[in-house]
């Protein structure tokens, strides 16, 4: 019997393959073996930070919008408090700015509205504008302290006669005002020593001129004091006793008669006729 004539079935392995395919795997299959848990954590953290940043930006925008609304409300309240004429001027200016801005948008931003003014703002009111300018000037003004050197001030850098006179007048008015606070300290600690210090660079001739000027001042003050003293005492500035007061005029006895020594015989009333015998 030949092997070719026999019939027999050859077992197939397809069933086994199908069984492998039909099996259900509950475990998730990773797409890649290179995924690191730390990378996953970093990615998740980055997403959370991005979300928090987005929320913060949104909140900031909401706060900014609220701030603008409050500012606009305040501007309108201030605008309502203005007088009628000022309101009309500001409204006219706002309308003009709006027309210029519309024209600039129409012509593609050719700078039609660039006239140096911003959009309508309540701060453009003349009084408010002046107040802001003064405030800005005060802020930009250098702060002077006791340690600030005076020679840095432009006033202490004179170059001509007019500037020296301005310096003299300014110093004179400022320093003499200190005598009102304390005349004793002004005289002993400032005026006398300051005059001496100022005469140090002078020549002998100019120093004598200073002395002559002071002598004139002394004589003038002596005359003023003497005038005030004599005026209080009733005298004159030259030292005299002053004008004598006129005596009141005597009133004549109209209708009376002239009396003489014979008219009054009262002294002989006590004598009798026998006294003459």
From Swiss-Prot:
Alphabetized UniProt keyword annotations: Coiled coil, Cytoplasm, Initiation factor, Protein biosynthesis
Coiled-coil ranges per UniProt: 37-82
Superkingdom classification of source: Eukaryota
GO MF annotation list: translation initiation factor activity
GO cellular component: eukaryotic 43S preinitiation complex; eukaryotic 48S preinitiation complex; eukaryotic translation initiation factor 3 complex
Basic and acidic residues bias spans: 40-83
Main localisation: cytoplasm
Skewed-composition ranges (Acidic residues): 20-39, 262-277
Region described as Disordered: 1-83, 223-277
GO biological process, one term: formation of cytoplasmic translation initiation complex
UniProt cross-references to Pfam families, sorted A to Z: eIF3_subunit
Cell compartment(s), UniProt: Cytoplasm
InterPro entries per UniProt: eIF3-like_dom_sf, eIF3j
Physiological role: Component of the eukaryotic translation initiation factor 3 (eIF-3) complex, which is involved in protein synthesis of a specialized repertoire of mRNAs and, together with other initiation factors, stimulates binding of mRNA and methionyl-tRNAi to the 40S ribosome. The eIF-3 complex specifically targets and initiates translation of a subset of mRNAs involved in cell proliferation.
Subunit relationships: Component of the eukaryotic translation initiation factor 3 (eIF-3) complex.
Family the UniProt entry places it in: Belongs to the eIF-3 subunit J family.
Name of the featured protein: Eukaryotic translation initiation factor 3 subunit J
Species whose genome carries this gene: Lodderomyces elongisporus (strain ATCC 11503 / CBS 2605 / JCM 1781 / NBRC 1676 / NRRL YB-4239)
Lineage of the organism: Eukaryota, Fungi, Dikarya, Ascomycota, Saccharomycotina
Gene designation per UniProt: HCR1
């Amino acid at each position: 019997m030949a092997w070719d004539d026999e019939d027999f079935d050859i077992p197939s392995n397809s069933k086994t393959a199908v069984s492998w395919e039909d099996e259900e795997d509950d475990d998730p299959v990773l797409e890649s073996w290179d995924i690191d848990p730390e990378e996953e954590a970093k990615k998740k953290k980055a997403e959370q930070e991005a979300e928090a940043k987005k929320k913060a930006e949104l909140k900031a925008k909401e706060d900014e919008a609220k701030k603008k609304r409050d500012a606009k409300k305040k501007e309108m309240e201030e605008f309502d408090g203005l007088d009628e004429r000022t309101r009309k001027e500001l409204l006219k200016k706002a309308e003009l700015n709006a027309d210029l801005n519309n024209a600039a948008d129409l012509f593609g931003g050719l700078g039609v509205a660039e006239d140096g003014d911003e959009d309508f703002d309540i701060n453009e009111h003349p009084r408010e504008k002046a107040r802001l300018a003064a405030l800005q000037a005060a802020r930009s003004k250098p702060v002077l302290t006791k340690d600030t050197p005076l020679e840095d001030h432009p006033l202490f850098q004179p170059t001509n006669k007019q500037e020296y006179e301005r310096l003299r007048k300014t110093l004179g008015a400022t320093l003499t005002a200190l005598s009102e606070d304390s005349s004793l300290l002004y005289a002993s600690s400032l005026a006398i020593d300051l005059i001496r210090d100022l005469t140090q660079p002078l020549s002998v001739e100019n120093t004598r001129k200073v002395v002559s000027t002071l002598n004139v001042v002394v004589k003038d003050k002596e005359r003023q004091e003497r005038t005030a003293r004599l005026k209080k005492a009733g005298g004159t500035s030259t030292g005299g006793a002053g004008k004598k007061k006129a005596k009141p005029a005597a009133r004549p006895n109209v209708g009376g008669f002239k009396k003489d020594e014979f008219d009054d015989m009262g002294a002989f009333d006590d004598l009798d006729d026998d006294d003459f015998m």
